[in-house]
């Protein structure tokens, strides 16, 4: 039998994506100014980034990056266990652990490899199992597959389903893993109830709080703290640095023994270059601002409420989210693509989320809010969405194949 030709396979997949009108396109950003983006020569007001606190362009953050780059250079030049672990890395780990109330922290290049590192290092036997919410981020799900352990999934937010899945796999070590804030829906996992399930089933509870830390909870400490939980209930927690903190990278916080084990055995940590010290210095400045500036979170709360009130008054279908992620359900993907295009014509950049990222018939506009938005910009967006809906409803839409 002839070996499959990879180029032929890729060509067939490309033709299918074109026929389905599902080709993914990268939009090139020329410049940024706060929440404004220059794309294709036009300035648009962005409601699509994860810069929830508006820290990515804050002058203290930029100054910290510039100063560290002048002192330490452009890169770490080695892995953490050779000579790439700088004072900046150590300080950032210590301050994030202290902020979140955890004994230890370990810095990773990004959240995807951090999730892989955790599962590969802890679930090393084929009888081990990772039980996950069906809507968890792809990095959590892919990490289980790559770790080689068993993956069992439960219906979204279904605590009893999580219990059933853990009971159904009693042989090996177990981890219960969940997003804290779900990135496409904006809702929050029932962390207290899940922590009880994990304890009853002798499973380690691991929470990915990529979208919560900095935004939710007391002093922005995230969903785990907001639920009144800590290291005793959630022994490991993922914090990403590229969303509310405006930079790049990820940190896993946890108890001393688990974090030490990751540092000594996690291949994605050991066999890669450490983050540039300048980037780490910028993130450290952002962490200090996030802890200090409660006004950023207060403004976000006001903007979220204003958006939801305005959208509800105009009859839009909202999802159960009190976070900066505010999806508007549009149904068919042809509708959401037309809505997104109409909004761009009106001067707004809003992400259109469609299958396979979300289920068929659940395409949506994914509006994300930042503390840098003004009430006037939020109202202008609502007005533009209403106009886009009216225009799109009168147009024949191209159906995907």
Curated annotation (Swiss-Prot):
GO terms for molecular function: 8-amino-7-oxononanoate synthase activity; pyridoxal phosphate binding. Substrate binds at residues 24, 137, 357. Keywords: Biotin biosynthesis, Pyridoxal phosphate, Transferase. Pyridoxal 5'-phosphate binds at residues 111-112, 183, 211, 240. Its cofactor is pyridoxal 5'-phosphate. It is an enzyme of class 2 (transferase). It holds the Pfam family Aminotran_1_2. One of its GO terms (biological process) is biotin biosynthetic process. The modification N6-(pyridoxal phosphate)lysine is found at residue 243. It catalyses: 6-carboxyhexanoyl-[ACP] + L-alanine + H(+) = (8S)-8-amino-7-oxononanoate + holo-[ACP] + CO2. Pathway: Cofactor biosynthesis; biotin biosynthesis. SUPFAM superfamilies: PLP-dependent transferases (SSF53383). The keyword Transferase applies. PANTHER family: 8-AMINO-7-OXONONANOATE SYNTHASE, CLASS II AMINOTRANSFERASE/8-AMINO-7-OXONONANOATE SYNTHASE. Homodimer. NCBIfam families: bioF (TIGR00858). Catalyzes the decarboxylative condensation of pimeloyl-[acyl-carrier protein] and L-alanine to produce 8-amino-7-oxononanoate (AON), [acyl-carrier protein], and carbon dioxide. This is 8-amino-7-oxononanoate synthase.
């Amino acid at each position: 039998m002839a070996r499959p030709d990879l180029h032929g396979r890729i060509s067939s997949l490309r033709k299918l994506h074109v026929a389905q009108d599902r080709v993914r396109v990268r939009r090139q950003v020329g410049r940024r100014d706060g929440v404004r983006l220059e794309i294709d020569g036009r300035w648009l007001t962005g409601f699509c980034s994860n810069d929830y606190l508006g820290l990515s362009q804050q002058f203290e953050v930029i100054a910290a990056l510039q100063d560290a780059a002048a002192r330490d250079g452009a890169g770490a030049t080695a892995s953490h266990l050779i000579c790439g672990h700088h004072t900046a890395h150590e300080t950032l780990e210590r301050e994030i652990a202290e902020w979140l109330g955890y004994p230890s922290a370990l810095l990773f290049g990004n959240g995807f490899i951090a999730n892989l590192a955790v599962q590969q290092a802890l679930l090393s036997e084929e009888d081990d199992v990772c039980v996950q919410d069906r809507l968890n981020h792809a990095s959590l799900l892919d990490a289980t597959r790559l770790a080689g352990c068993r993956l069992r999934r439960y219906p979204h937010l279904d605590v009893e389903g999580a219990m059933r899945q853990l009971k159904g796999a009693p042989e090996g070590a177990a981890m219960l893993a969940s997003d804290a804030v779900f990135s496409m829906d904006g809702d929050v996992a029932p962390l207290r109830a899940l922590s009880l399930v994990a304890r009853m089933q002798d499973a380690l509870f691991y929470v990915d709080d990529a979208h919560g830390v900095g935004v939710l909870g007391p002093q922005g400490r995230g969903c785990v703290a907001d639920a009144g939980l800590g290291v005793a209930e959630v022994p490991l927690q993922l914090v990403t640095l590229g969303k509310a903190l405006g930079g790049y990278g990820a940190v896993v916080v946890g108890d001393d023994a688990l974090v030490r084990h990751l540092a000594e055995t996690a291949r994605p940590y050991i066999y890669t270059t450490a983050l540039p010290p300048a980037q780490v210095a910028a993130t450290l400045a952002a962490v200090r601002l996030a802890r200090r500036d409660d006004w950023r979170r207060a403004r976000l709360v006001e903007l979220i409420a204003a958006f939801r009130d305005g959208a509800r008054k105009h009859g839009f279908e909202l999802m159960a989210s009190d976070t900066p992620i505010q999806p508007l359900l549009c149904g068919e993907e042809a509708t959401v693509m037309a809505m997104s295009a109409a909004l761009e014509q009106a001067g707004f950049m809003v992400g259109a989320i469609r299958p396979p990222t979300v289920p068929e018939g659940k395409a949506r506009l994914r509006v994300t809010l930042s503390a840098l938005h003004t009430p006037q910009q939020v109202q202008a967006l609502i007005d533009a969405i209403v106009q886009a809906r009216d225009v799109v409803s009168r147009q024949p839409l191209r159906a995907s194949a």
